[in-house]
Amino acid sequence: MSRVLHPIFLFGKTSFLYSGCSKFGGRLFNNSIVHGWLRTRSYALASGLHPLRKQKLAHFEDLANANMSDPYMQAKLYKELADNFPEAIISRYETQGVARNSACDRYYQEALRKKSWSRSLSNNISLSQSSSSPATSSFSDPKAFSAGVPKFTSDTSSTVSSTPSLNHSLQNSMPPSTPTPPPVWAPTIVSSALGTSSKTPVYVVVDEPRFTKFFRIFKFIAGLSVASYFVLLGMSIFAETSGLNNIMTNTTEQEPMEERAINVRFSDVQGVDEAKEELEEIVDFLRDPTHFTRLGGKLPRGVLLTGPPGTGKTMLARAVAGEANVPFFFMSGSQFDEMYVGVGAKRVRELFAAARKQAPSIIFIDELDAIGQKRNARDAAHMRQTLNQLLVDLDGFSKNEDLAHPVVFIGATNFPESLDPALTRPGRFDRHIHVPLPDVRGRLAILLQHTRHVPLGKDVDLSIIARGTSGFAGADLANLINQAAVYASKNLSTAVSMRDLEWSKDRILMGAERKSAFITPENKLMTAYHEGGHALVALFTKNAMRPYKATIMPRGSSLGMTISLPDMDKDSWTREEYLAMLDVTMGGRAAEELLYGKDKITSGAHNDIDKATQVARRMVTEFGMSDRIGPVSLEAEMDNLSPATRALVESEIKSLLEASYERSLSLLKSHKKELDALATALVDYEFLTAEEMNRVVKGDRDLLRNKLS
């Protein structure tokens, strides 16, 4: 079976089909797959046609493809294609194996006229003739023409038999003035010979799928991004290691900060007298190192300052440098951590090198736990490198440098337990100094220090503020003074009064006042009785701390508060004092029950009950203050106690709380008149001091006039 390559012109693009000549029929294009391909690739998918028009074209195309030897079927298809698809008529007419008749010739002639293919017209007329008669030929050299015409097989000779009528019709249709076309080879004949030799190659353009185009674009963008990332990374590493970054930005942010003229002295640091005494030895060592080394002794070179935040560790280090009058190099622990491996160790070396050049000097690293945490196998390499370099420099310079020009290393941290043992061992940090929270005398000294440049009113008693700020650090006290000064300035006052200081303290302890909170008169009265119960029990209970202030002004989540102040800071408490503490705590709930009855008590006492339960539990399980339990510590073993022992512990806690509640209720019943007066005064004024509460309890009726004046 022979195969012939047929060019099919479909809408300006050339496609090629192989058609086989079967030994049973000799019919061309008899494969149903080829027919379907012709239909779907040609007219049916043409854009801009009505769907019904497309279906009609597809129908006639199927009929024409199924009857390739029937010229009438071809003519019907040409008729449908004549208006919109002249290229398709020309392409199909010039295809070998397609039957023709006079009607097909007319449609072909009309299609050529529309496309103005005059050369193709004359050549294809000669191609359709069955014999080369000189009488009917319009060319002067038939041999030259026949040389360019491809030979047909015997199967196609029967399909091209009606060419004289085509020649006659073409000659009659041409106008008289039209000259005879020259014998030029038609494009169709050249096209039919495409692919037959190397001189006439077939150019095939493969249309890529849309997914392939997108994937190629994505690969290009991804490759460009990766390449750009590595280029920028290399440039940043080069700029960091070569110092170009600092030159371009003109910054020394990560360089050791050196201060020579430090004005801080030990007199500026208050409330930490013990820490100052230990650091004074370091100052004397920096001033005269030979005085301590003449007998072979060595003073510590590394000092670790520990303690809660805000206690003055940084100020102590600056005071050491200021007293010794030596250069002071400061860096934070977080400044050693960078994204590049090795930068932290490099900065440690630079810090110690700069300090040695200026010796005697002081190196201070704040928040030392940022680089000195305990090491483990899971740590990143750069973290271990920074700590290792710090360990080497700490142990190295103390042995090799000149004793006449020492370098003292001071570190500060709030979490000494997190530091690596190799860092805190003797030889690196020889001395550990704890900087605690100040006691009442220390707080008073700090308040006096921070109010040196603040004008105070005549009514200000800083000792009362110091007694009421237990647990405040130096930074908290400085903030208290600053807020009071700002509040007084806002109120156009000429000096800071005691009321301004109390407002600032209450704001820090309890939060801002909620003056806009809507409270019904009933709830306000109940809150006044609740706070009055606390204050009254504190006034009439032996060993209880005296009430300092009572208020029903909402602050934070609290609707009111009664504050008691100790005379001094206490580290231990007696059993009587703990029982008095329980009675005062239960006074608020007892006052509610006394006024409204047991069924009208509220949930406002939940915080009081929680505190009282904690005190009673510690009395039983930690302090050995229970007669039935005895002097036994059970807090650490509560989970391992037997059910009977645990029940006994809970029973003792409950007994202490119930006894305290009954004592408070009995006291308030005996002082019901004073309770009513105290609650009424709180409703009227919302705030009572200790002196005002004493006057109300004694029946002073001039309180309103004195308070308003």
Swiss-Prot record:
Gene Ontology biological-process entries: mitochondrial protein quality control; mitochondrion organization; protein quality control for misfolded or incompletely synthesized proteins
Membrane topology: Single-pass membrane protein
Cofactor: Zn(2+)
Enzyme class: hydrolase
GO cellular component terms attached to this protein's record: i-AAA complex; mitochondrial inner membrane; mitochondrion
Cofactor notes: Binds 1 zinc ion per subunit.
Entry EC no(s): 3.4.24.-
CDD domains: RecA-like_FtsH (cd19501)
PANTHER family documented for this protein: ATP-DEPENDENT ZINC METALLOPROTEASE YME1L1, METALLOPROTEASE M41 FTSH
Protein family (similarity comment): In the N-terminal section; belongs to the AAA ATPase family.
Name of the protein this chain belongs to: ATP-dependent zinc metalloprotease YME1 homolog
Source species of the chain: Schizosaccharomyces pombe (strain 972 / ATCC 24843) (Fission yeast)
